[in-house]
């Protein structure tokens, strides 16, 4: 599943080709992804793309008449093409520019979304979201206050979009390992110093992942079709029973909040 770094990598990859350009047409090859594709998106035709933002794992393609909100779901990807190449089986949406370039959306599992948001309105999918993890609003004091009286596992807590957005499963595992924190620790039990360490490591892990082009485990590719290379940096994710890089103890795997969790029983407390 594309997480925040993969979505940010996609934004950085497509923006130079699209922002400031004019949309010639919108090609819809399916009426429905996770939700029905709204016909209001056709209003994009003839409009100039003013900016492409990211909020959590949503991309927002902004024009004067409204915005397209794009979510990659479990297996979605965006590519920039330099012409009208034949559509493959799972190519569901094309945003065709007057320059001849086109943004193509591919999604084998169809859990992604293309939505519409009118100007000066906020779509419901963007409501009740916590701060962005790479901003100053995400800090140790905020997280300690947010975790007060929260007995859920710290891993589940940092993956809750109401607390902080975009800390997906891969990066939660890696950040907790780097911080030497056990993923099952109750969120309220972390000290301010431990929150300072964890917040700093979440920021660092996400920044490195973005720099490396994200993590390609199966479906994700960058906008130029290349894979993300952060998979080569993973220390614990997907490495159950392999030796811990710090102490050599076999790494454990356990389900926490229905997500595969990897940790060292010796190093993480």
UniProtKB/Swiss-Prot annotation:
Q: What's the superkingdom here?
A: Bacteria
Zinc fingers (FPG-type) at which residues? 235-269
Q: Which GO terms describe its molecular function?
A: 8-oxo-7,8-dihydroguanine DNA N-glycosylase activity; class I DNA-(apurinic or apyrimidinic site) endonuclease activity; damaged DNA binding; DNA-(apurinic or apyrimidinic site) endonuclease activity; zinc ion binding
Q: Looking at the Swiss-Prot or TrEMBL record, what is one Pfam family this protein matches? A: Fapy_DNA_glyco
Listed A to Z, the keywords are: DNA damage, DNA repair, DNA-binding, Glycosidase, Hydrolase, Lyase, Metal-binding, Multifunctional enzyme, Zinc, Zinc-finger
Cofactor (UniProt): Zn(2+)
User: Which transformation does this protein catalyse, written as a reaction?
Assistant: Hydrolysis of DNA containing ring-opened 7-methylguanine residues, releasing 2,6-diamino-4-hydroxy-5-(N-methyl)formamidopyrimidine; 2'-deoxyribonucleotide-(2'-deoxyribose 5'-phosphate)-2'-deoxyribonucleotide-DNA = a 3'-end 2'-deoxyribonucleotide-(2,3-dehydro-2,3-deoxyribose 5'-phosphate)-DNA + a 5'-end 5'-phospho-2'-deoxyribonucleoside-DNA + H(+)
Q: Which SUPFAM superfamilies match?
A: Glucocorticoid receptor-like (DNA-binding domain), N-terminal domain of MutM-like DNA repair proteins, S13-like H2TH domain
Q: Does the keyword Phosphoprotein apply?
A: no
Instruction: Tell me the active site.
Output: 2 (schiff-base intermediate with dna), 3 (proton donor), 57 (proton donor), 259 (proton donor)
**Residues involved in DNA binding:** 90, 109, 150
Per the entry, the cofactor note is: Binds 1 zinc ion per subunit.
Which biological processes are named by the entry's GO terms?
A: base-excision repair
Which Enzyme Commission number(s) are listed? 3.2.2.23, 4.2.99.18
Establish whether keyword Zinc-finger is in the entry: yes
Q: How does it assemble?
A: Monomer.
Q: What does this protein do?
A: Involved in base excision repair of DNA damaged by oxidation or by mutagenic agents. Acts as a DNA glycosylase that recognizes and removes damaged bases. Has a preference for oxidized purines, such as 7,8-dihydro-8-oxoguanine (8-oxoG). Has AP (apurinic/apyrimidinic) lyase activity and introduces nicks in the DNA strand. Cleaves the DNA backbone by beta-delta elimination to generate a single-strand break at the site of the removed base with both 3'- and 5'-phosphates.
UniProt xrefs under HAMAP family: Fapy_DNA_glycosyl (MF_00103)
Q: What name does UniProt use for this protein?
A: Formamidopyrimidine-DNA glycosylase
């Amino acid at each position: 599943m594309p997480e925040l770094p993969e979505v940010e990598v996609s934004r950085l990859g497509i923006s130079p080709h699209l922002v400031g350009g004019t949309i010639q047409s919108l090609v819809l090859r399916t009426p429905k992804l996770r939700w029905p594709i709204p016909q209001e998106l056709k209003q994009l035709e003839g409009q100039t793309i003013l900016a492409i933002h990211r909020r959590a794992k949503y991309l927002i393609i902004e024009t004067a008449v409204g915005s397209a909100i794009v979510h990659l779901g479990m297996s979605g990807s965006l590519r920039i093409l330099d012409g009208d190449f034949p559509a493959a089986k799972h190519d569901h949406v094309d945003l065709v520019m007057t320059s001849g370039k086109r943004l193509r959306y591919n999604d084998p599992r169809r859990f992604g979304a293309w939505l519409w948001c009118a100007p000066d309105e906020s779509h419901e999918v963007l409501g009740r979201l916590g701060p962005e993890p790479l901003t100053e609003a995400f800090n140790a004091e905020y997280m300690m206050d947010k975790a007060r009286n929260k007995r859920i596992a710290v891993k589940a807590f940092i993956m809750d979009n109401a607390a902080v957005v975009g800390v997906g499963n891969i990066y939660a595992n890696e950040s907790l390992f780097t911080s030497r924190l056990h993923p099952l620790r109750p969120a309220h039990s972390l000290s301010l110093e431990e929150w300072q360490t964890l917040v700093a490591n979440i920021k660092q892990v996400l920044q490195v992942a973005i720099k490396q082009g994200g993590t390609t485990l199966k479906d994700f590719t960058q906008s130029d079709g290349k894979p993300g290379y952060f998979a080569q940096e993973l220390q614990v994710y997907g490495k159950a029973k392999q030796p811990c890089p710090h102490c050599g103890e076999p790494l454990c795997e356990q389900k926490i909040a229905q997500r595969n969790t990897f940790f060292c029983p010796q190093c993480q407390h």
